[in-house]
Design a protein with these regions (language model features):
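Outer membrane beta-barrel transmembrane domains
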Residues: 116, 350, 363-365, 369-414, ...
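Bacterial N-terminal signal peptides
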Residues: 8-17
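Detector for outer-membrane/organellar transmembrane beta-barrel domains
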Residues: 274-382
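Outer-membrane beta-barrel "beta-signal"
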Residues: 225, 399, 422-442
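Outer-membrane beta-barrel translocator domains and adjoining extracellular loop/strand segments
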Residues: 116-123, 158-168, 194-198, 250-257, ...
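N-terminal periplasmic/intermembrane-space "pro-region" immediately following the signal or transit peptide
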Residues: 21-120, 439-442
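Outer membrane beta-barrel
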Residues: 90-249, 255-274, 278, 283-285, ...
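Bacterial N-terminal signal peptides that target proteins for export
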Residues: 1-8
C-alpha cells in the first residue's frame, strides 16, 4: 500500500513539473504579446495625434472653400447691386460669411533666462526677460483673399516698443495660377528666416542669418508672387519672387527707395516610405551705399553717407538649403537641416567683400514630449576682414509640454572671429500660446 502511495506521489510530482515547464514558454509568449500590444497602442496614440492635426487643417480648408462656394453661388444667381455710395455691394452669401469682425486671434509669449560670460550690459545678458509677446490676427477677407497680421512687443533694456512683424494681404487665383501677397512679411529665403522665433528648435537664429539679415532675420514691406512650375518629372517645384523695401537687412543699403530683389526655388522628394528631402535655392540682389570721401580744407578727409544710395545692385547673395526628414516608428523623427549663404560685394561699406556662412542642425525627437539636437555654425562675417571666422556649437534639449507650450534648454560655445574672447552661454526659454494660431508652437 505504501508502495502505491509512493508511486502515485512520484507520478503527481512529475506531472506538475512537466506542466510548469510547459507553462514557462507560454508565459514568455504572453509577455512578448503584451509588449507588442503596448507598442501598438503607443503608435495608435501618435497616429491619432497626427490625424487630429490633419482634421483641424482640413476643417480650415473646408471653411474657406465653403465661403468661396457661397459667394460664387450668389454671384450666379444675382448680380451685385450698387450701394448708396455707388460701390458695388457684396453678394449676400459673402456678407453673411465675412461681414462680421471675427478673426482668429492668438497671443504668443516667449520668456528667456540667459547666463553668459559676456560682460556687456546687452539685452538679456545674465537676466530673465520677456523676450517677445506676439499678437496674431488672421481672417478670410472674401472668397478670394485673406489677411494676416503679427504685432510684437518686447521688454527691451532701453525702451519697450511695439513692432509690426508682419501685416499682409494674400490674393489667390491670380492669372496663370499665381498667388500674390502684399504688405510686410518675412522674406521667403531658405528655411529659418520664414519662421518666428518661437517656432525655432533653438533659442536663437543661426549666426549667418543674424549677420546677413539682422537679429530676427529679414522682414520687410513688399510684394511677393508664388507659383508651381510644371515639369516632365511631375515633381513639386515652387518658385517665389519678391520686391522688398531696401531699408532692412544688414547686408544692404538701408535706404527705402533702393529695393531688394530675391527669388527662391524649392522642390520636394519622397526618397523612401519613411524619408523625404527638401531642396531650395536663393538669390538676392540689392544696393550698397558706400560713403563719399570728401577732402576738407585742412587736408583731412570726411566720410559722408549719401541718402540717395549708390552702387546699383552692388550686393549679390546666393544661398542653398537642404532638409532631410526621417520618420521612425512610435512617432519618433530625425531632422537634418542645412543652409549656406555667400555674398559678392565691394569692401567699401563692410570690411569683408566675400562674407559667407552656414549652419547644420540635427534634431532627434525621441518621444512625443522630448527632443534633443545640436546646431553647428560657421560665419565669415561682414565686418571682420582677413578671412577670420566665427564658430559655434549649440546643443539643446526641448520638452514639448503640448502643442501650445514648450521649454527649451540650450548651451552655446562660441569662438568669435578676430581674436575676441571665447564666450559660453546658457539659455532657458519658455514659449506659450493661447488662441487660434496658424502655426503651432511645436
Amino acid at each position: 500500500m505504501r508502495l502505491h502511495q509512493w508511486l502515485f506521489s512520484l507520478l503527481l510530482f512529475l506531472f506538475v513539473s512537466t506542466q510548469a515547464q510547459a507553462a514557462d514558454p507560454q508565459i514568455e509568449i504572453l509577455k512578448n504579446n503584451m509588449a507588442q500590444l503596448q507598442q501598438s497602442m503607443q503608435s495608435l496614440r501618435n497616429n491619432m495625434s497626427d490625424l487630429k492635426m490633419t482634421v483641424e487643417n482640413q476643417n480650415e480648408v473646408i471653411r474657406q472653400q465653403s465661403i468661396q462656394i457661397a459667394g460664387l453661388r450668389n454671384e450666379r444667381g444675382t448680380a451685385a447691386q450698387p450701394s448708396q455710395s455707388g460701390v458695388a455691394a457684396l453678394p449676400s452669401g459673402i456678407q453673411k460669411a465675412v461681414g462680421g469682425f471675427n478673426p482668429d486671434i492668438a497671443v504668443v509669449g516667449t520668456t528667456q533666462a540667459k547666463l553668459t560670460q559676456n560682460k556687456s550690459d546687452a539685452d538679456g545678458n545674465n537676466a530673465i526677460t520677456l523676450k517677445e509677446l506676439e499678437l496674431n490676427f488672421s481672417q478670410v477677407v472674401d472668397p478670394f483673399s485673406r489677411m494676416d497680421a503679427v504685432i510684437s512687443f518686447n521688454d527691451s533694456l532701453e525702451t519697450q516698443n511695439a513692432n509690426i512683424e508682419e501685416a499682409y494681404y494674400t490674393r489667390w487665383g491670380l492669372p496663370f495660377g499665381f498667388t500674390g501677397q502684399i504688405g510686410k512679411f518675412r522674406a521667403d529665403i531658405g528655411k529659418e528666416n520664414l519662421l518666428h522665433a518661437h517656432q525655432l528648435e533653438t533659442v536663437d537664429y543661426p549666426f549667418v542669418i543674424r549677420d546677413f539679415f539682422g537679429d530676427e532675420g529679414l522682414a520687410s514691406s513688399g510684394l511677393r508672387l508664388k507659383n508651381e512650375i510644371p515639369n516632365p518629372w511631375d515633381l513639386p517645384l515652387e518658385i517665389s519672387g519678391e520686391i522688398l523695401r531696401g531699408n532692412n537687412g544688414n547686408s544692404f543699403s538701408g535706404i527705402s527707395r533702393t529695393p531688394i530683389f530675391d527669388t527662391h526655388l524649392k522642390s520636394f522628394f519622397q526618397t523612401t516610405d519613411d524619408t523625404n528631402l527638401e531642396l531650395g535655392l536663393t538669390t538676392m540682389f540689392g544696393d550698397e551705399n558706400p560713403p563719399l570721401r570728401v577732402l576738407n580744407g585742412d587736408g583731412t578727409f570726411t566720410d559722408i553717407t549719401r541718402s540717395q544710395g549708390t552702387d546699383r545692385f552692388g550686393v549679390k547673395i546666393f544661398g542653398g538649403d537642404a532638409t532631410f526628414n526621417w520618420f521612425l516608428p512610435e512617432g519618433k523623427k530625425v531632422v537634418c537641416q542645412n543652409e549656406l549663404y555667400f555674398q559678392n560685394r565691394t569692401d567699401l561699406v563692410h570690411l569683408n567683400d566675400d562674407p559667407w556662412g552656414f549652419y547644420s542642425l540635427v534634431d532627434y525627437k525621441f518621444s512625443e514630449k522630448f527632443s534633443t539636437g545640436v546646431r553647428f555654425d560657421y560665419l565669415n562675417p561682414l565686418d571682420v576682414g582677413g578671412g577670420h571666422g566665427t564658430t559655434s556649437v549649440s546643443p539643446y534639449f526641448i520638452f514639448w509640454q503640448s502643442e501650445f507650450a514648450d521649454m527649451k534648454l540650450q548651451y552655446t560655445h562660441t569662438v568669435p572671429a578676430g581674436g575676441e574672447k571665447t564666450d559660453n552661454s546658457a539659455f532657458f526659454v519658455v514659449d506659450f500660446m493661447i488662441g487660434a494660431h496658424k502655426h503651432a508652437v511645436q
